[in-house]
């Protein structure tokens, strides 16, 4: 059967108007019905019989057809559908209805629709033009706004208010369309009709706005957006943040938003009565829309919605029912063998890091942390229904030009669902979600922000410290509970924001000061800092070897471009392996559980001591971070169980982040006045961290030159304190009644250092130095505790000098202090 030919004239309708028969569409309908009846699979069975049987169910009305099957069956039919899609679409739906009737009893008034999947060509949003109106297209983009589902009038039945005649099946052209004239020959009514809703046909209708993805965007261009119209079963198939493919056609619709302005101009000058004015607002204005002002715009009528890249998790990165078998079926044999080979690689951890960031030299710990963030932990739900996040949040703090933004850009390009934004240019609504008014329905709808767009992905936030405080508070909930709660303009909703956050921040003043703790170097609040699992600090230090290596790497990139990049695995290999590894749900073994508890206890003990000062307080959130990192390590090795070796690496990475000890030189120039003040307020001291910071920030007092040189590095101070503590603990274990005084410790230390002392001046200096160290261990770090024997004597015996009283004090090690490894 040949397709083509002009439309032939047909019969006349009741009103005497001539109807035209579309022969091309009729032939398409007949050929398409034959295709549905005759299309066979590899096993010889009909491909669409089972799908058509599903259409008998009341809630189903759409048949999905693979467009490649049509091309294989009849290329001319496929070409006609592609070029004349909007013209032949109603006839294709009738063919589906005829095919479904062969499967069983179907209500006479039930409408059916068709959806085409796997359409070969894909158009960019920027390439849509009026030349493509009515043809079958496939476009892709990221959903930024979804409207609620409404019923749409597709075919109306009207009642003439003059003669009570019924006008059936008036097709609605994307706006409220009344009959042009009453079908009664003796009635000349053209305006007064009422809609009979019981006999009219409605269909589910939803508007979705999509935007160009960052990869398709030309450099320096503003992203274009287009409205998608979804009907029937296609509604609610795309959520805000999804990257989807839409198959359908480009159409022209009246611009309803221009109606208000047009009506306002029209009604102010018109001398009409109240009734006519009401009709003008409700019916006549819509009827005249686009006729006077030519207010039309392009929209996309979609029949099918699919994931942009389902093989790499373009839409659903963490599908709960995803199994190893289903992922394997999506890969070729060679791809699956490569994934299996990677899982057996004994040096997988290192190779993944180098392959993921080949252009960044060094910073191995940050590469490992970002890699574990991409694998992620296991999300859990307690018996009470509380959700525990599995995503890992990472913050990179560093001096300028230390490749912070490069890490963020690499992750954005690699991850299938990542959003890159800047903290200073982002508001709270832009990061979470905004409530905006629809220009047509004047209803409030939710427009997704960066965290919603990155749902099931990674949100990269640069210049995180430049955000306003009120904007930082807005993401508290998203970082821990992974939801966004909105109560604005009558809209109350809780939205998902299951995203990992990779943030980059600059220190206060532009340079990281080692003499201050992390919280004083970064302009971030304590609640925000506690929600990050890993903190990495980058300091721009002058190192001849490192500077040479970095310069060589940069020059190689500029000279040879991609040739100088050495990758063990390609980006596609890592994406496939990441998708496969993320379906593992590792369980914590008994040995790993005990090891996690022991490591957390060590972190808490280390945080309580004054010497090993932490970046921030160790809380239960760090315990949860340790669990998430351990699960991520197990996922990376495709293990179903978390082993102690996974916990060990997670603890090492967490320790690099948490115990970032700021070690300025220790000065002993405080004088004896502080000693007296400390002694009086011994019970009201602050914690060790604050005491350490107070000591660091104090200016050097003007003292005699005898005390001016009493300084030592923090490493030397720590070494001496460890020697003293080890000696005291050894003496307490060997002797039942051990009474070590300050004098005993001084004499023991000088005896140990006898080989290094040559002159009397050095002896006096060493003696004064060890006395100052012991004084600091007692009053500042609280590692040693003094017990005063003079309390047992009478008041007359206590009239001694301060030196005698000090020498008489018994010293013991604080029982809560634990030596570092």
From Swiss-Prot:
A Gene Ontology term for the protein's cellular component: nucleus
Pfam families in the record: MCM, MCM6_C, MCM_lid, MCM_N, MCM_OB
Region (Disordered): 665-707
Assigned keywords, A-Z: ATP-binding, Cell cycle, Chromosome, DNA replication, DNA-binding, Helicase, Hydrolase, Metal-binding, Nucleotide-binding, Nucleus, Zinc, Zinc-finger
Biased composition annotated in UniProt, kind: Polar residues: 697-707
Biased composition (Low complexity): 679-689
Known EC number: 3.6.4.12
Positions of the MCM domain: 348-555
GO biological process, alphabetically ordered: cell cycle DNA replication; DNA replication; DNA replication initiation; double-strand break repair via break-induced replication; mitotic DNA replication; regulation of DNA-templated DNA replication initiation
Keyword flag Nucleotide-binding: yes
Statement: the UniProt record of this protein carries the keyword Nucleotide-binding: yes
SMART domains for this protein: MCM (SM00350)
Reaction catalysed by this enzyme: ATP + H2O = ADP + phosphate + H(+)
InterPro entries (UniProt xref): MCM, MCM6, Mcm6_C, MCM_CS, MCM_dom, MCM_lid, MCM_N, MCM_OB
Motif (Arginine finger): 530-533
Main location (coarse class): nucleus
GO molecular function, one term: zinc ion binding
Matching CDD domains: MCM6 (cd17757)
Binding site for ATP: 398-405
Domain of life: Eukaryota
Compartments reported by the entry: Nucleus; Chromosome
Enzyme category, top tier: hydrolase
Zn finger region (C4-type): 160-187
Function: Acts as a component of the mcm2-7 complex (mcm complex) which is the putative replicative helicase essential for 'once per cell cycle' DNA replication initiation and elongation in eukaryotic cells. The active ATPase sites in the mcm2-7 ring are formed through the interaction surfaces of two neighboring subunits such that a critical structure of a conserved arginine finger motif is provided in trans relative to the ATP-binding site of the Walker A box of the adjacent subunit. The six ATPase active sites, however, are likely to contribute differentially to the complex helicase activity.
Subunit composition and interactions: Component of the mcm2-7 complex (RLF-M). The complex forms a toroidal hexameric ring with the proposed subunit order mcm2-mcm6-mcm4-mcm7-mcm3-mcm5. The heterodimer of mmcm3/mcm5 interacts with mcm4, mmcm6, mcm7 and weakly with mcm2. Component of the CMG helicase complex, composed of the mcm2-7 complex, the GINS complex and cdc45.
Protein name, as recorded: Maternal DNA replication licensing factor mcm6
Native organism: Xenopus laevis
Taxonomic classification: Eukaryota, Metazoa, Chordata, Craniata, Vertebrata
């Amino acid at each position: 059967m040949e397709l083509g030919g002009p439309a032939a004239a047909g019969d006349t309708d009741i009103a005497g108007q001539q109807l035209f028969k579309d022969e091309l569409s009729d032939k398409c309908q007949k050929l398409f019905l034959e295709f549905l009846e005759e299309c066979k699979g590899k096993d010889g069975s009909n491909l669409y019989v089972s799908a058509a049987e599903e259409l008998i169910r009341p809630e189903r009305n759409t048949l999905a057809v693979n467009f490649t099957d049509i091309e294989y069956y009849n290329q001319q039919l496929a070409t006609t559908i592609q070029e004349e899609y909007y013209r032949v679409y109603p006839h294709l739906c009738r063919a589906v209805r005829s095919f479904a009737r062969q499967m069983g009893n179907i209500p006479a008034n039930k409408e059916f629709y068709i959806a085409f999947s796997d359409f070969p060509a894909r158009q960019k949003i920027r390439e849509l033009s009026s030349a493509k109106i009515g043809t079958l297209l496939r476009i892709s983009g990221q959903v930024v706004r979804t409207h609620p589902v409404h019923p749409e009038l597709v075919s109306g039945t009207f009642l003439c208010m003059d003669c009570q005649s019924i006008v059936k099946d008036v097709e609605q052209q994307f706006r409220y369309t009344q009959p042009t004239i009453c079908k009664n020959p003796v009635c000349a009514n053209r305006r007064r009709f009422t809609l009979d809703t019981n006999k009219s046909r409605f269909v589910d209708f939803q508007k979705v706005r999509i935007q160009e993805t960052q990869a398709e965007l030309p450099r320096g261009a503003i992203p274009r957006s287009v409205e998608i119209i979804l009907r029937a079963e296609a509604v609610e198939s795309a959520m805000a943040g999804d990257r989807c493919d839409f198959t359908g056609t480009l159409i022209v619709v009246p611009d309803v938003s221009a109606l208000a302005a047009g009506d306002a101009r029209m009604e102010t000058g018109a001398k009409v009565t109240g009734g006519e004015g009401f009709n003008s607002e409700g019916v006549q204005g819509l009827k005249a829309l686009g006729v006077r002002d030519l207010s039309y715009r392009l929209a996309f009528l979609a029949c099918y919605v699919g994931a942009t890249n389902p093989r790499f998790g373009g839409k659903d990165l963490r599908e709960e029912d995803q199994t190893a078998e289903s992922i394997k079926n999506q890969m070729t044999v060679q791809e699956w063998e490569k994934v299996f080979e990677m899982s057996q690689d004994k040096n997988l951890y290192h190779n993944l890091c180098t392959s993921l960031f080949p252009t960044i030299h060094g910073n191995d710990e940050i590469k490992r942390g970002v890699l574990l963030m991409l694998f992620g932990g296991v999300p859990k739900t307690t018996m009470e229904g509380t959700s525990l996040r599995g995503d890992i949040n990472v913050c990179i703090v560093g001096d300028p030009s230390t490749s912070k933004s490069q890490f963020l850009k690499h992750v954005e390009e690699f991850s299938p669902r990542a959003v890159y934004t800047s903290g200073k240019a982002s508001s709270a609504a832009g990061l979470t979600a905004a409530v905006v008014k629809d220009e047509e329905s004047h209803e409030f709808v939710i427009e997704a922000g960066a965290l919603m767009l990155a749902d099931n992905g990674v949100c990269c936030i640069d210049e995180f410290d430049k955000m306003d405080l009120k904007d930082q508070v807005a993401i508290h909930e998203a970082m821990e509970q992974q939801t966004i709660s909105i109560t604005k303009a009558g809209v109350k909703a809780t939205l998902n924001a299951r995203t990992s956050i990779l943030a980059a921040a600059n220190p206060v003043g532009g340079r990281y000061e080692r003499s201050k703790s992390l919280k004083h170097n970064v302009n971030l609040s304590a609640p925000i800092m506690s929600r990050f699992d890993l903190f990495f600090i980058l300091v721009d230090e002058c190192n001849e070897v490192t500077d040479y290596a970095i310069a060589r790497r940069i020059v190689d990139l500029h000279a040879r471009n991609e040739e100088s990049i050495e990758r063990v695995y390609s980006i596609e290999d890592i994406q496939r392996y990441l998708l496969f590894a993320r379906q593992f749900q590792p369980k914590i073994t008994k040995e790993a559980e005990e090891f996690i508890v022991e490591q957390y206890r060590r972190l808490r003990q280390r945080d309580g001591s004054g010497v090993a000062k932490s970046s921030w307080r160790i809380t239960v959130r760090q315990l949860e971070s340790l669990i998430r990192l351990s699960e991520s390590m197990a996922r990376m090795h495709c293990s179903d169980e978390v082993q102690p070796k996974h916990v060990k690496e997670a603890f090492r990475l967490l320790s690099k982040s948490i115990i970032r000890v700021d070690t300025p030189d220790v000065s002993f120039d405080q004088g004896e006045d502080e000693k007296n003040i400390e002694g009086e307020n011994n019970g009201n001291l602050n914690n060790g961290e604050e005491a350490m910071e107070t000591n660091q920030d104090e200016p050097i007092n003007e003292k005699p030159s005898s005390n001016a040189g009493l300084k030592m590095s923090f490493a030397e101070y720590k070494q001496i304190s460890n020697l003293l503590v080890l000696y005291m603990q050894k003496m307490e274990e060997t002797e039942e009644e051990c009474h070590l005084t300050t004098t005993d410790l001084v004499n023991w230390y000088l005896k140990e250092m006898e080989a290094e002392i040559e002159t009397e001046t050095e002896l006096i200096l060493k003696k004064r130095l060890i006395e100052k160290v012991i004084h600091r261990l007692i009053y500042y770090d609280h590692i040693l505790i003094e017990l005063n024997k003079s309390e047992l004597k009478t008041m007359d015996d206590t009239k001694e000098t301060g030196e005698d009283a000090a020498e008489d004090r018994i010293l013991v090690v604080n029982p809560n202090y634990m030596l570092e490894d």
